[in-house]
C-alpha cells in the first residue's frame, strides 16, 4: 500500500465519526509535531476534501506527512476562528500561513502614578499606571518622537530610583531637556500643565494646544514676564516644526491600513498605522508557507495572528475581500475585549487613495524582499554543491564561542534560513555556569546520563536560551585556550534540545574551528547517533582572514577563492556568529566587573550591596553618587561611604 493511500485511509477512518458541525482539526507528523491547524464550518465536509484526487502539491505533501489527526468541536464559527488562531500561535505548524515577526509595537507611555509623571518608551500590554500613545511602527520612530518631546516640553525620562536619589540636576537639565523636578526646579502645578500639553500633542489636538500657548504667551508678555513668554514662543515654533516634519492626515484618525500584494507566489502584507490623525509608520510582513494560497487566505490568517498581539484601532482598512468578514470582526473583538470594530474596503475617496498608495509601497517592499530571497537561494544552491548536501539547505546553524583566557565563556548559535538571518532563533550558552565534569563523555539522551558526576548543572534540559542575567553568575573558568571543551558542551546541550525538537534540525552546521574541532563534532554526533552535515571553518595557519580553510570528515582540507560570492557569504555567516559571541561575552564580563567592584569593598556584603543598588537603581548611579548621597542608604555610614567612593573612583 502506498504512503498516499495509507494517509488517505487515515483521514477516511476519521470521517466515520466526524460530525457535520463547526470546529478545528489538527494534523500531526510521525514525531507527533502539529504540522497543520485548520477550521471548518462543517468538519465532515472539510475532511472529505483531503481524500480528493485533484489536490495541489502543498496539500499532497501535507497529507503525506500526516500520521495522526484530531479534531475539536466548537459552539460557533467565531469560537472555531479563535481556537484556530490560538493553536497556530502555540504550535507554529509548518504548513500553516505564519506571521513570523510578531513582536509587539512600541508605544510612548506617560506614567501618571507619580507627582512628576515620567515619559518613556514602552512595549507590552497597557497598564493602569499611565497612558500609552501609539503604536509606532519602529523603536526609531518612538525614540525620535521622545527626543522631540523632551526638547519641547522637558518632562523627565529617568526612573523613580534615579529621581529619588538626586541632590543636584543631572545632564538632561544642563542640555535643556528636563526641568529637574527631582531637585525642585519646577513646581507640581507647572509640571502638570506641561503633562497636559504633552497629552494634547500626542492625541492630535495640536491646533488647540498652539492656540492655548499663544494666549498664555500674550498673558505673560502683558505681565512683563518676557523670559517665560520667550520660552512659550520657542515651544510654539518647535511644535510647528515637528508638525511640518510629521505626516498629518485629515482623512484617517485612528485606523490600520492593511494591504496584501502578491508576486511570483510570494506575498507581502504591509501595515500602515494612523493614530490621532498622524501617520505612525509602516512595516511590511512576509508570511511563510503561502504556496498555493490566495490573497483572501493570506489576509485572513494575517489578521487573526496580528491582532492577537497588537492594539486594535476603531477601524481596519483593507484592500482585498476576506471570507466571513463578520465572524472575523467578532473574533478580533473577543481576542482584544473590545466592543466596536469596523473592517472596510474603500471604493472611492480619500481612503481609497490611501489604500492604493499603500499597495504600491507594499509591492516595492515585496520586490526588495524577493531580490534578497532569490540571491539567498542562489547561494544556498552553491552551498549544497560545495559541501555535498543531499538537498538545498533551509536552515544553517553557525557556532562560535568567546572568552578571555577561559573566563566569562559563552557559546552561541546563529541561524540563517531561506530569507536570511533568523534572529529569533539565535541562542546563547552560558558556558561559565556549567561544571567541567560534562567532559566525562556520559552523553546519551537521558538527563541523568548527560550530567553524570555534575553537581552544578542540575537540569540540562533547561532551555538553551540562557537568560543574560545568568551568564556571569558562576566561578568556573576553563583552562586557557580550551576551545574544544567549550564546543563539546555547546554541542551536547544543543543536540539534546534538537532531539526533542526535530523540526528544528539544521541542514548544515558550520563551526568556527579547525581539525581539532572537527574531531570534537564527530565524537559528539556519534554519541548522539545523529547525522547532521557539518563543516569546520578556520582562518588558516597564520590566522588571517581571507585564506580560510574548510575541514570536513573524510575530505582533504580545501580553500576557496576569496573573490567568490559564496566565500564572501560564508565569511558573513562566520562574522555574524563571531560578533554575536563577543557581544554576549562582553555583556557578561561587564556585569561581573560591576558586581565584583562592590564585592571587593571591605564592609560591603550582600545586604549592603543590594541596598545600594536598590536605592540608586543602577551600578552607574552608585558610581556617580557623592559621599553625602551614599550615606543616605540604610547601613552606610560616613566612613564606609568614603571607602566606597574612593574604591569606585580608583577604577
Curated annotation (Swiss-Prot):
UniProt keyword annotation of DNA repair present: yes
The organism's place on the tree of life at top rank: Bacteria
Annotated GIY-YIG domain residues: 20-97
Keywords attached to this entry: Cytoplasm, DNA damage, DNA excision, DNA repair, Excision nuclease, SOS response
Disulfide bonds: none
KW Secreted (keyword) present: no
SMART domains xrefs: GIYc (SM00465), HhH1 (SM00278)
InterPro entries referenced in this protein's UniProt entry, alphabetically: GIY-YIG_endonuc (IPR000305), GIY-YIG_endonuc_sf (IPR035901), GIY-YIG_UvrC_Cho (IPR047296), Hlx-hairpin-Hlx_DNA-bd_motif (IPR003583), RuvA_2-like (IPR010994), UVR_dom (IPR001943), UVR_dom_sf (IPR036876), UvrABC_protein_C (IPR050066)
A GO molecular-function descriptor: DNA binding
Domain spans labelled UVR: 207-242
Principal location listed in the UniProt entry: cytoplasm
One Pfam match: HHH_5
Localization of this protein: Cytoplasm
Gene Ontology, cellular component aspect: cytoplasm; excinuclease repair complex
CDD domains: GIY-YIG_UvrC_Cho
GO biological process terms held by the UniProt record: nucleotide-excision repair; SOS response
Assembly with partners or alone: Interacts with UvrB in an incision complex.
Role this protein plays: The UvrABC repair system catalyzes the recognition and processing of DNA lesions. UvrC both incises the 5' and 3' sides of the lesion. The N-terminal half is responsible for the 3' incision and the C-terminal half is responsible for the 5' incision.
Recorded family membership: Belongs to the UvrC family.
Name of protein: UvrABC system protein C
UniProt source species: Rickettsia akari (strain Hartford)
The gene coding this protein: uvrC
